[in-house]
C-alpha cells in the first residue's frame, strides 16, 4: 500500500546556529509553521556526554514581560467585549452565527521583542487612560446596585410592619432581629424564646404565602446570643437590616429611584465604553496576536541547548517540507547554520495526518479515537467515504437529509469562515445530508410517508425491493452485507499493518483467520460441505493454534460484531416510524378537532419533525461513529502516543509586511 495511506513521512532536523542568528532562525521556523520543536534540554541534563558539550538553554529574559502584557491585553479585550455584548440581542447573535464579520488581516512590521514591548506599553497606556476610570465607576455602580437591591428586597418583605428601621439598630441595651420562619415552627419558637427570657417583643406578619411568617424580634442585648442560637436551630432565615434607615415604604421608594439612576449612569458609561471598543478593538486584537506569537517564540528557547556562542535545536519536519525548511534556516542564518537530516526512530516520531483535501475534516474523528502509530495505515480516507453513508443509512429520510445539508451549509458559510472546526463540521454535515437524501429517495422516506399520506403519490425514485415500509427484511440484508464488507476491509487493513511491521503471527491469528472462516462458510453455502468444510476446519484449527481455547470463544464475539450492523436497520426504521407517527397525529388533528385543529396540525407537524430530525440525526451521528470506533477500528487500529504539534505562528488578524 502506497505512502498516501500512511501518516506524513517525517525526518528529524538538527540545527546548530550562532547565537546572534538564533532569534532569526526561530522567527523563520515559526512563520513557516511546518516543524515541531523537540525538547533536548532534558536529554542534556540526563546524558553525561551531552552535558560536556551543551548546557540547557532558557526562555529569554523578555518572556515574563511579554506574558504580563498579553494578560493585560486579553483582560482589556474581555472587559470591552463583555460591555459591547450587553446590548446585543437574539437577532444580532443569529445574524453573527449565519454571517459572522470577517476580520481583514492587517499588515504589520516584523518587530523585535523590545520594540513590540514598547509598542504594547504605549497602546495599553492610551487605552487604559480612557477605560480605567469608567471601569472603576462601573464596578462601583454594580456594587451599589447589589446593595440597593438587597435593601429593597428586605424592605419589601417587611413592608407590612409600621416601623422605622433606625429603631431596630443595635444600641447599648437593645438589639433588633428580622427574618422568616415557617408557620408551623412559630409556636415552638415562641415557647423556646419564652424559656430564655420574657424581656422581648415578637411581631409577626404573613409572608409571601400562608406557610411562612415574617418576624421582628426586639430584646435586650444581653440575650442576643442565646436567642440567635435558638433561631439557627429553628431554621430561621435572618434578614440583614443593619444598614437600613427609615420606614419600609420610604426605603422601597428611594431604592427604586436609585436603581433607575444607576441604570441610567451605567447606560451612559457603557455607551462610552462601546465607542472606545469600536475605536480600539481591532488594534487590541492585532496586539494580542502579536504578543501571543512573541510569547511562544521567547518560551521555545527553553527547549534548546547552547554553548557560549552557539544554539542547538532539534525539530521534526515532514519529508516533503524538509528541503524548504533547510533553505529557510540557511537564509535566516546567512548561511552560517549547520543542518543534519536524520531518519527517525518510528517509536519517537510525532504523527501528522496527511490526507487529500476532501478527507481533511474527518481527521478530527481519527484523532479523537487515538493518535496513529507512525507506520500504520491511516483510515481517514476510508472514513470520509463510509461515515456519511452510514449516517444516511441510519436516517434514510430525504426531507431530513435536506435539512441537515442546509444546516451544514450554514455552518460552512457562516461560522466556518472564522472557525476551522465549524467549517469541517459543516462539510461533514453536508455530506451526511446528501447521503440521507439519496437513501431516503430510494427507500421511500421523505418526512416519513408525507407524499403517500397527504398527496397519495409515491416517490418516483423508490426502488420497491428496498422500500423501508414494505420490505424491511431487505434493508436488514443490506445492513448486514455492508457490515461484512466493512469488517472485512478492516481485517485486510489489520493484516496489512501487521505484515508490514513483521507481526505475521498476529496477522494470521487475529485477521486472516476470520477471512478464511468467512470464505469457508460462503463455499459451504454455495457448493456444499465438500468445498466449505476444509476451510472451516482450517479456520478453527488456526484459532486454537494462535489463540488457544479462548480463540473459539472469539467466534461468538465476531458474530456479535457483524450483527452490530443491524443497528443501521433499527435507526432507519425508527426514523421512518416516528416520522409516520407525527404525520398520523397531524392528519388526525386536522380532521377530528374542529376549528383549533387547523392551527394545531401545523404545530404538531413542524415541531414533531424538528424534534425527530434532531434526535435521529444525533443518533445517526453517534452510531456511525460507534460502528467505526468499536467494530471497524478494532480490526486493525493499533494507536500510538505522539501527535504532531506544529511550531506555528497562528495569524488570524495580522500578516507580515514583506
Curated annotation (Swiss-Prot):
Disulfide bonds: none annotated. Keywords: Cell membrane, Hydrogen ion transport, Ion transport, Membrane, Transmembrane, Transmembrane helix, Transport. InterPro entries: V-ATPase_116kDa_su. The chain crosses the membrane at residues 383-403, 427-447, 475-495, 507-526, 530-552, 568-588, 591-611. GO terms for molecular function: ATPase binding; proton-transporting ATPase activity, rotational mechanism. GO terms for biological process: vacuolar acidification. It is found in: Cell membrane. It is a multi-pass membrane protein. One of its GO terms (cellular component) is vacuolar proton-transporting V-type ATPase complex. It comes from the Archaea. PANTHER family: V-TYPE PROTON ATPASE SUBUNIT A, VACUOLAR PROTON ATPASES. Has multiple subunits with at least A(3), B(3), C, D, E, F, H, I and proteolipid K(x). Component of the A-type ATP synthase that produces ATP from ADP in the presence of a proton gradient across the membrane. Belongs to the V-ATPase 116 kDa subunit family. This is A-type ATP synthase subunit I.
